[in-house]
Amino acid sequence: MAEKLIINFDEYTKIVEKLAIQIHKNYNPTVLVGIMRGAAPIIDILSRILKLPIAYIVIQSYSGKGMEDKQGQLMFAREISSLANNEDFNKVLLIDDLSDTGLTPNKSIEWLKNYGPTKDYIKEVKTACLWKKKSSTFEPDFCPVRLDTDPWIVQPTEHYEELSIEEIIKRN
């Protein structure tokens, strides 16, 4: 199993704020598009800071049980979830939590540029993430943390995947 990089909420929000500063100084997107689930909290914070409309694309990667450091085939949802107008998709900032193998951002850009309702409005797609792993072949446009290794990044809410609702009820 890969080494682990454990991130708490304070560290996480500081990294998102650094990403917001990078974006503010270097790009003027018209919409933020988050890759779910990893980008959900990032998009929430960035949209409040940058005052931009948001959209979500849902992608699932299947690699099999017990394969923490492997990525499988990607499956895209049929639609984008957004209240943004089609015209807002002029300058897209596509956001994920991390750049690992590079498969997700590459395939997401391709999918987004071919998505029927907005494809004619998209003039530019740039990318952002919080972490870029050393072995990633994808180079995001904005990334506050570039790692020298390829750790498994344990994000602040990840522990909930290991808890049952019964355990949470007992704690509360």
Regions found by a protein language model. Name each.
Residues M1-N172:
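PRPP-associated nucleotide enzymes
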